[in-house]
Curated annotation (Swiss-Prot):
This is CASP-like protein 2B1. Keywords: Cell membrane, Membrane, Transmembrane, Transmembrane helix. It comes from the Eukaryota. It is found in: Cell membrane. It comes from Populus trichocarpa.
Length: 202
């Protein structure tokens, strides 16, 4: 060990312990923060697009109003994206606080909580998108065998806005899957050989 406190390899090459870990940690936290902001914004957008979507159509002198509550899958989509947006906002605040404090590593219990939460949100958003997409296909194409008519031929504006909401929700679910992979990396690297070298926990 030199007087500068820098480890020296047999080849007289200085080795700075923990530097790579800190760089990787900063990049991971930045990617996590960006994804959480994206999920928060797109989740709110998807919920607003679908939740505020209505269209009135007059059929045989009778006015029929299409709402997202007419399809339970769309109600599930709005709720799931609202929950995902709120969850991502809270986690985003946590990321900002951690970056301001300059923390490098966090405790394993907290890492498990974040990992589990991200996994749950990923499954929730993916299932909501899948259910909404299936219902939208029936609304668009109908189901002749069950004598279900093509709803979108009458409520074109309503279906178009729902489609935009589902597209936003799809981006949310994809981002959530990527984020769950990042949280898995952040968790399981704590069990690697480099854990505890930097000594900062939060």
């Amino acid at each position: 060990m030199s007087y500068l406190g820098v480890g020296v390899s047999p080849g007289n090459v200085p080795v700075y312990h923990g530097t790579n870990s800190k760089v990787i940690d900063r990049r991971v936290r930045l990617a996590e923060l960006v994804l959480r902001c994206v999920i928060c914004c797109l989740g709110v957008l998807a919920a607003v697009l679908v939740g505020t979507d209505t269209q009135v159509k007059e059929i045989f002198s009778i006015q029929k109003k299409a709402r997202f509550t007419d399809m339970k899958a769309l109600v599930f989509l709005v709720a799931a994206n609202g929950i995902a947006a709120a969850y991502s906002f809270v986690q985003g605040v946590r990321c900002v606080v951690g970056m301001v404090k300059g923390s490098v590593l966090f405790s394993k219990p907290l890492a498990w909580v974040i990992f589990s939460g991200d996994q749950m949100m990923a499954y929730l958003t993916m299932s909501a998108v899948a259910a909404a997409a299936q219902s939208s296909v029936f609304a668009k194409l109908g189901q002749p065998d069950l004598q279900w008519m093509k709803i979108c031929t009458m409520y074109g504006k309503f279906c178009n806005q729902v489609g935009e909401g589902i597209a936003s929700a799809l981006l949310v679910s994809v981002s959530m899957v990527v984020l769950s992979c990042i949280s898995a990396f952040s968790l399981f690297r704590l069990y690697g050989g480099n854990k505890g070298k930097d000594g900062a926990r939060w």
